[in-house]
């Protein structure tokens, strides 16, 4: 698995995202499905002569993880050095409360936390092979227009034709850039801005992939079997695909309470994501273009007024948007990043729990509940 492309991409991540220093202390937590990735990162850190400990964990439920993790965590010396936490999981996002309880004894300014879901070679060779500063400028440019918008019209080459209403006074935006902030957890892969749309009407054609907060071995690619969804007032009223397996899958998803509601309007901004992956993956969601998340929303509790145990992202390939009455359109795949500062009126606090000791999680999908990811088997 460890070829030149992956090796170089891991080093790029450690340099451009983590900004490693010789006196840093790195601890890697990983689930068995991400053992090879964790091992490759560990090997790179060893070559760089960076102190590193590795601790495995069972996904979701592990009664002995807290004790193992406590033994792996170092005592930071006075006068320098950071604690860098890297977690790698394929389908899950585990043990938030336990991890943050352990980390609460460390000074926030000396703590960096990067949590990767969809861990696989492509996480590094594709999604993390673009500098976070570049993603930051793409996000900044879009948010500069969208956060003052009331209406957005969206079209794609695949046939999407949507009219969307925004309520930026009520609904917050999430911006996943891959940039670390004090007291925040960075979710990887990076590259998305998202909010809750006040209203969505029209036709949406998902012709790239889907992503689900569930364990599934389904082929998530939709390039050769697109899905057409008809939306009225933010709810799916009809959907079609020539692929019977896709329709069966959607039937299983949409039968759940509130699963037909649009809970997220998202725009992917990672231009190193090109072809969709077979696996259920957040990497697909970062594809430049538009996606709609059905079911669970990405807003703080109580803002929207409903909950759903499922979040299904349907992802289109590319897209063009028109904002309010501005004649200039924005091609989501190729727009030029503008020299604007990233807004400070965004959130990475989709789900807040006082048990997390004020360390917040960037969660564009809003699928994390009480520090754990809720999962279902859908096949």
What residue spans do the PLM features occupy?
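Active-site bordering "gate/hinge" segments
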Residues: 1-224, 325, 336-379
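Generic beta-strand/beta-sheet core signal
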Residues: 29-31, 207, 232, 239, ...
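Short, isolated positions in well-ordered beta-strands
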Residues: 161-162, 237, 328-330
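Structured core elements
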Residues: 163, 203-205, 228-230, 238, ...
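Short linear motifs in exposed loops
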Residues: 165, 240, 331-333
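Dual-mode signal for accessory low-complexity, basic/Gly-rich regions
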Residues: 222-223, 239-302, 351-363
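Active-site and channel-lining beta-strand-loop segments
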Residues: 225-240, 321
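Internal helix-turn-beta structural module
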Residues: 281-284, 288-363
